[in-house]
C-alpha cells in the first residue's frame, strides 16, 4: 500500500509534540509567578511536575516527580500548571486518549521567560 510507515508516523508525531510541548510550556511559564527573594536566594531550585493532558487540552492530573525542597517554589510551579488549564487540544495526529508530559521548573527557565 501507499500508506506512511509506522516510523514516518512516529517521526511526525514527535515533531508535532515538540511544537505542542513548546506551546504549552510557554503558556505555563507565563502563569508562573516566583520571585527569587521568596525562594530564599537559592538559585538551584528545581522541581519536576508531570501533567496528564486529555485530548481536548483539559489538564486531568498534576503531580510532582521531584520536589525542590522549597515549598514556596513548589507551590508556585504547581499553581502555574493549574492556572494554565485548559491547554490547547492535543495535536491532530496524536491518537492516544491522553498525553503525559514532565516539566522541569528551575530558575534559569524562569529567567529565560520574562
PLM regions and their residue ranges:
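Compositionally biased, low-complexity segments enriched in charged/polar and small residues
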Residues: 1-48, 54, 58-63, 71-75, ...
